[in-house]
A protein has these predicted regions:
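Ribosome-associated RNA-binding proteins
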Residues: 1-178
Length: 178
């Protein structure tokens, strides 16, 4: 029988609803489904407990994954996650804006049709000149939004040494630069 216990900081609360774990803190709340056969996730007092009766490699790997997810959720609701992106163009000036729940890029390589990337979850997008800052409590939502914005400006079948226009991730959580 394996058991992992993750302590909750004072400003964080957690609760389970069947297979969904919700963690709330000063930066917001994050809900995630944590389900795997023979693995239970429970909130006991001021800790999140992950238990299993099975000892096979796949179950142990899943328990480690669940532990990382819970730690990321706790970090997200206490400090948040932040990505920085850089807008780069050489000839056609791009206009990047936020409209409703999407990031809109206009005049990319002189195109007339705007390109749109959805904003995932509770991600907050701030545009300041040539820099875009994405922040939020959910690491996956913020990272997915940043990745979709970067992929939106990808130029297929062209030499990337020549066609350098785009929006690029320059700083990620846990890494100094990308």
């Amino acid at each position: 029988m394996s058991r992992i216990e993750i302590q909750l900081p004072e400003s964080v609360s957690a609760e389970t609803d069947r297979f969904d774990l919700t963690v709330e803190g000063p930066e917001g709340s994050v809900t995630r489904r944590l389900w795997f056969p023979n693995v239970t996730v429970e909130v006991t007092g001021e800790a999140v407990t992950i238990e299993t009766d099975s000892e096979d490699a796949k179950t142990n790997a899943t328990m480690g994954t669940f532990e990382s997810h819970v730690e990321n959720m706790i970090h997200g609701v206490t400090e948040g996650f932040e990505y920085r992106m850089q807008i780069h163009y050489s000839h056609f000036p791009m206009q990047v804006s936020v409209e409703d729940d999407a990031v809109v890029i206009q005049n990319f390589l002189g195109e007339t049709a705007p390109r749109r990337a959805p904003i995932r979850g509770e991600t907050d997008v701030q545009i300041d000149g040539e820099e875009i800052t994405l922040s939020g409590p959910d690491k996956e939502a913020v990272g997915q939004t940043a990745g979709e914005i970067e992929q939106l400006t990808r130029v297929p079948d062209k030499d990337t040494r020549v066609f350098q226009d785009g929006v690029y991730i320059v700083e990620k959580p846990g890494r100094g630069g990308a």
